Amino acid sequence: MFEGFERRLVDVGDVTINCVVGGSGPALLLLHGFPQNLHMWARVAPLLANEYTVVCADLRGYGGSSKPVGAPDHANYSFRAMASDQRELMRTLGFERFHLVGHDRGGRTGHRMALDHPDSVLSLAVLDIIPTYVMFEEVDRFVARAYWHWYFLQQPAPYPEKVIGADPDTFYEGCLFGWGATGADGFDPEQLEEYRKQWRDPAAIHGSCCDYRAGGTIDFELDHGDLGRQVQCPALVFSGSAGLMHSLFEMQVVWAPRLANMRFASLPGGHFFVDRFPDDTARILREFLSDARSGIHQTERRES
């Protein structure tokens, strides 16, 4: 996987971020979600690398990145901390400004980065998510049943870690295959093996739990403080039409107050449509990124 890409471990302060870098052109950061890692992009990144310098990175707590012990206030696993990690990664690699595509937790990290560091994010694509604040504020019995793991994973340590650790494959495969609206056949075997390596690591189990603990505490508070703020860069809301998120929320309506310059796209499949439809995913991302770049250039010409 990732033939022609360079594997890097980059020190960004208190953690080290694992990434792969390949291609040439404007910088593009691809971020994964739960319960995956950077290998979710293995069949998409090469399709973008002829036009972009593509960086696929593991979030802290996932894959080959550092997995610190969670702090009592959960701040070291907040999306603010994760966004800071990834921004510093890109700056260390030589990119002050870049396009950002994030799936699931990576999309939440991207949304936070676009709020905290708007000068760094040229365009933002959020894949199959709604804002963290809305996920907690608009809970009904259907949302609670579909997203039960949000509440289980944020329980105090070490309870969820021990439950998951007793049989990690059953837990995580239940998430992956259930939300994906498909079985194991919908995933590349090499990618699945990389996910399983992560699932079986107790430090990664702890990291993902800490991620969700932050979601229900500090991330919610930060998002509440930013109600009314809009991301100004070009933005794409991209979902799987057979997924739970798409069926439970009017995604365009939910995102419209938060993204000033938004478009919407969807593909068949569930939450993990990137794995199932890499060619179509890359095509839609290329179209969005091309239009975003054209709009940025037009704005820069008007301002010069």
From Swiss-Prot:
SUPFAM superfamilies documented for this protein: alpha/beta-Hydrolases
Annotated site location: Important for enzyme activity: 128
Inducing or repressing factors: Up-regulated by fluoroacetate. Not detectable in the absence of fluoroacetate, or when cells are grown on Luria broth.
GO biological process: acylglycerol catabolic process
Keywords: Hydrolase
Any single Gene Ontology cellular-component annotation: membrane
Matching Gene3D superfamilies: alpha/beta hydrolase
Highest taxon above the source species: Bacteria
Job of this protein: Catalyzes the hydrolytic defluorination of fluoroacetate to produce glycolate. Has only very low activity towards chloroacetate and bromoacetate.
Name of the protein: Fluoroacetate dehalogenase
Source organism per UniProt: Burkholderia sp
